[in-house]
Swiss-Prot record:
InterPro entries noted in UniProt: Membr_insert_effic_factor_YidD
Taxonomy, superkingdom: Bacteria
Protein name: Putative membrane protein insertion efficiency factor
Any one cellular-component term (Gene Ontology): plasma membrane
Keyword Membrane: yes
Primary residence: membrane
Family in the record: Belongs to the UPF0161 family.
Organism listed in the record: Staphylococcus carnosus (strain TM300)
C-alpha cells in the first residue's frame, strides 16, 4: 500500500502538478508533506496526515512552514530500569 500511495504522489508531481500554477500555501508543499508523512508514519497514518494538511490548503489559511510531525518513540515510555 505504501508503494501505491507514493506512486500516486509521484504521478501527481511528475505529470499533473507541472500543468497547474504553484498554489500551495505551505512549505513543504502538500504533496511533499504527504510523501514524507507516508515515509515516516506508514501509509495509513501518513495518508491521514496528508489529507488533513491538504484540507487546510486554501486561501483562508495563512499557510507557512508546517513540517511532518516526528514519529513518537515508544521505547522510552515504559522504562524498566530503576533509578537510585
Amino acid at each position: 500500500m505504501k508503494k501505491l500511495f507514493l506512486g500516486l504522489i509521484w504521478v501527481y508531481q511528475r505529470f499533473i502538478s507541472p500543468l497547474t500554477p504553484p498554489s500551495c500555501r505551505f512549505y513543504p508543499t502538500c504533496s511533499n508533506y504527504t510523501k514524507e508523512a507516508i515515509e515516516v508514519h506508514g501509509p495509513i497514518k501518513g495518508a491521514w496526515l496528508g489529507i488533513k494538511r491538504i484540507s487546510k490548503c486554501h486561501p483562508l489559511h495563512k499557510g507557512g512552514f508546517d513540517p511532518v510531525p516526528l514519529k513518537k518513540d515508544n521505547n522510552h515510555q515504559h522504562c524498566e530500569h530503576h533509578h537510585h
